[in-house]
């Protein structure tokens, strides 16, 4: 953690949360539309 103090923890958590929600959203959208049914 060399960058501790340079990058706010809340900013990292916010970006990480948005990224996770985006990936999960795309996964469920693909499964719902039938594109991810083969995965």
From Swiss-Prot:
Q: Note the NCBIfam families from the entry.
A: PRK02565.1
UniProt KW Membrane keyword: yes
Tell me what this protein is called: Photosystem II reaction center protein J
Q: Name one GO cellular component term.
A: photosystem II reaction center
- Family assignment? Belongs to the PsbJ family.
Q: Which gene encodes it?
A: psbJ
Ranges that cross the membrane = 7-27
Q: What does this protein do?
A: One of the components of the core complex of photosystem II (PSII). PSII is a light-driven water:plastoquinone oxidoreductase that uses light energy to abstract electrons from H(2)O, generating O(2) and a proton gradient subsequently used for ATP formation. It consists of a core antenna complex that captures photons, and an electron transfer chain that converts photonic excitation into a charge separation.
GO biological process annotations for this chain's record? photosynthesis
Q: Could you confirm whether the keyword S-adenosyl-L-methionine appears in this record?
A: no
Q: Which SUPFAM superfamilies match?
A: Photosystem II reaction center protein J, PsbJ (SSF161021)
* Subunit relationships: PSII is composed of 1 copy each of membrane proteins PsbA, PsbB, PsbC, PsbD, PsbE, PsbF, PsbH, PsbI, PsbJ, PsbK, PsbL, PsbM, PsbT, PsbX, PsbY, PsbZ, Psb30/Ycf12, at least 3 peripheral proteins of the oxygen-evolving complex and a large number of cofactors. It forms dimeric complexes.
The cross-references to InterPro entries, in alphabetical order and at most eight, read: PSII_PsbJ, PSII_PsbJ_sf
Please give, as recorded in its UniProt entry, the membrane topology of this protein: Single-pass membrane protein
The record's subcellular locations are: Plastid, Chloroplast thylakoid membrane
Question: The organism's lineage?
Answer: Eukaryota, Rhodophyta, Bangiophyceae, Cyanidiales, Cyanidiaceae
- Organism in which the protein naturally occurs: Cyanidioschyzon merolae (strain NIES-3377 / 10D) (Unicellular red alga)
Main site of residence?
Answer: plastid
Give the UniProt keywords, A-Z: Chloroplast, Membrane, Photosynthesis, Photosystem II, Plastid, Reaction center, Thylakoid, Transmembrane, Transmembrane helix
